[in-house]
Amino acid sequence: MNQTRVFLIFAWLMVAALLWMEWGKEKAAANAPGAAATQSVPAARDLDAATPSAANVPAAQAIPQAGAPGKVPATSTTTATPAAAGTAPVVTLTSDVLRLKLDGRSVLDAELLQFPQTKDGTAPVSLLTEDAAHPYNATSGWASEHSPVPGVGGFRAEQPGTTFELAKGQNTLVVPFVWNGPNGVSIRRTFTLERGRYAISIKDEVINKSAAPWNGYVFRKLSRVPTILSRGMTNPDSFSFNGATWYSPQAGYERRAFKDYMDDGGLNRQITGGWIALLQHHFFTAWIPQNDQASLYVLNKDGPRDVAELRGPAFTVAPGQTATTEARLWVGPKLVSLIAKEDVKGLDRVIDYSRFSIMAIIGQGLFWVLSHLHSFLHNWGWAIVGLVVLLRLVLYPLSSAQYKSSAKMRKFQPRLAQLKERYGDDRVKYQQATMELFKKEKINPMGGCLPLLIQMPIFFALYWVLVESVELRQAPWLGWIQDLTARDPHFILPALNIAIMWATQKLTPTPGIDPMQAKMMQFMPLVFGAMMAFVPSGLVLYWVVNGGLNLLIQWWMIRQHGEKPSKIIRANAK
């Protein structure tokens, strides 16, 4: 198979794959529930007010060891009898990476201080928000059938003031809240923020100084009115998955759109350990319970809101005893290094390099190489250039074999022409004779395909690495490229790509090429250039450097085999 045909196959496969991905985005947009836009949305601080209904709540468990957790409620419908409470003052907690606004029960707003919304240094990204149209909150509450529990506004900060900040030289910020219920029952909730960490530790201590056992269970939920994103290659935010995901040691990892969950009746599963999360481009929130903690995992819709929830464990706290439960709330970016430090099994799956496992593995490998190159070069753009150089070195033996195969094919073109003339329209005999010739002369007709076929999964895996990696978000290369995950604003790299592809065509021998193929080849640089104008500039940088190196290697190999590049260029110009 000659190089021209291989290139055409590769080109059309790329076009088809990109069109398929774009069609998938448009289809997802068409399937998005339009009714959500017309439903009334409550105020942001009311998002956590709804507690489960009073129906079918299991009775208090027989008292186990004092203070020990009981079983998780076996149904998805639960209740709460909150003690009367007013509106709690909003308290602000600030670390070096997070600024949180909370009332002790819900985190109402969370700003990611090291991630501005735009490159020009605007306000930081608000992952959790009180925005009236699209509120997004994280709540941790208590529910019970008979015992008093804190309602909205029930918790109060133990220390005076409404602003607490991680001081210089301090690595941990600890802020306790308390709810004092009737009859001597209280719950002490402690928020712990650490320097450089996006996981917030939340510890609850149920202290029973009453004369009767206290029964209840904790629920933790993420509640979001999703934003309907405009779909298209010019909107990177629409490329990434936006929905719910969860993981359990028993069932593994699952990621689906809320619509798919609702079509199947939602999620209602008892799990020990694991985690549940809401994902969006570059960022996510997640509730991470203790490894030995049993919870009821619930995914459902509450009007226009997507709700991901953990219910449990249930507690029976004997008089004079204390029960404790802890969890982590992740509010932050999909940073590989920081996620790994949490040591939570499966949490790295929130970084979605591909829905296909083999492509995800390739993507993880590419990012590993990129991150190590970045540690030396201190620039993600130059790390991409370094990755291309490494790949070309690894693939050089295949490229050399490809050119040798192509050169051998050109050598036998006159004999192939004789066979075609001999057998005329009898294609079966012509193919048989051709294969016998290849076998006799030890020619591999597929020799030119292998390097390109190997590059295809690398190319598409790198596409998803660039789209998904928050490390590259707003990362500059040089000059006009100030964000490698966004398109080239001046289309310089796509133009260079067109020029390099055109030069490669002129340097590629095409003896006996079909006239129709020749016309198609003339348009391929323009087709690729148009596609590259709307994909991340980091991907175009990869393709430009790869194409430039390939052009130089091809020039050198032509001379190594005793051919003259100028002669090939003149032959292609005819």
Swiss-Prot record:
| Keywords for the protein's UniProt record, in alphabetical order | Cell inner membrane, Cell membrane, Chaperone, Membrane, Protein transport, Transmembrane, Transmembrane helix, Transport
A single Pfam family, by name? Answer: 60KD_IMP
Chief place of localization: membrane
Q: Where is the signal peptide?
A: none
Q: Where are the transmembrane segments?
A: 6-26, 350-370, 376-396, 447-467, 491-511, 525-545
Q: Where in the cell is it found?
A: Cell inner membrane
> InterPro entries under this entry?
Membr_insert_YidC, Membr_insert_YidC_N, YidC/ALB3/OXA1/COX18, YidC/Oxa/ALB_C, YidC_ALB_C, YidC_periplasmic_sf
How does this chain assemble? Interacts with the Sec translocase complex via SecD. Specifically interacts with transmembrane segments of nascent integral membrane proteins during membrane integration.
Name listed for the protein in its UniProt record: Membrane protein insertase YidC
Give the organism, scientific name: Xanthomonas oryzae pv. oryzae (strain PXO99A)
Q: What is the lineage of its organism?
A: Bacteria, Pseudomonadati, Pseudomonadota, Gammaproteobacteria, Lysobacterales
Gene expressing this chain: yidC
